[in-house]
Amino acid sequence: MKVLMFGWEFPPKIYGGLAVASYGITKGLSLQGDMETTFCLPKPCGDEEKFLNIIGMNQVPIVWRDVDYDYLKSRLSTSTPEQYYAFRDHIYSDFSYMHVNDLGCMEFAGGYPGNLHDEINNFSIIAGVVARQQEFDIIHAHDWLTYPAGVHAKLVSGKPLCIHVHATDFDRSRGKVNPTVYAMEKNGMDHADCIMCVSELTRQTVIHQYHQDPRKCFAMHNAVYPLSQDLLDIPRPDHSKEKVVTFLGRITMQKGPEYFVEAAALVLKRTRNIRFVMAGSGDMLDAMINLAAERGIADRFHFPGFQRGRQVYEAYKNSDVFVMPSVSEPFGIAPLEAMQCGTPSIISKQSGCGEILDKVIKTDYWDINAMADAIYSICTNPSLFQYL
């Protein structure tokens, strides 16, 4: 079976959990033997693994240009002249009014720029060229950013569309939904033949908030791959005198970072032998630094910034407790990664991963007293640490 997949992130360029999930799914499909995946990205870096076919949408022409073969070889970093010409033969409309480069291709910033909605629209236009040129059996679109591309590919090809709901705007916004994003999400769901949700929690949101037929909505939980030996060999420091409690993720409203800081303040009223780490970046970072200072715990708080690759697992190994106090977490793969590293986890009851995890402590995200009790208990009770 051939899958035409649309995604917005892919390792080694990681902006969040979407890249990790996209990698895991495509890697798993590649091991099936009878699956061939073509993954469309706005702007590949060229260092992606080669177990799947990657199409850089920034190197697919939408305006016809008479370009020399040798010039193409020098200009195309992640594609070939042959592929360029094949796509050029399937340009389906006059897009000369669009802003394109000398190859007739659209440029993408990559990631999540200020003109994100423009890039989503451009991505879907290019998807029309790709869907006309490629041979495939099914379309798979990851998250709202690529739903328009998936819908366009379905309308062009008539092939079934599976959308993968990693999160909804209800999760990201605490209910203050962006109507434009909601409309894109609902349009993708309405056109989808199958809706894959990362948890039953998310499935219920899709059914009730987006008014979808339960018969086409399925909960498909995320998972993690076994760690490589070099990551398993990362040593755990001796924290017999001073424990380390870590929050690792985007420092945004959805992730509940303020509840972590407030719980830390309660714990530090009982003992000063614990350090707290808030690793990540986001629009609430400065506010959390200020909140830690206001609570008088800045000397016990560390903000190391965004962690990549091996740094993530070093952070887990360096922790005695991992805390994920998300307000609304469709799944949340970080606790699974922490547990792989032998680090006990505390998660909010509003997290989808709680549906499959037993040996974790679960509290309501807003219950900072329960969260503080759990942190203190794990840090002071070696038996509980070993059990978890």
What is each residue range found by the language model?
Residues 201, 223:
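Carbohydrate-associated surface elements
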Residues 344-347:
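Short hydrophobic beta-strand element within catalytic cores of glycosyltransferases
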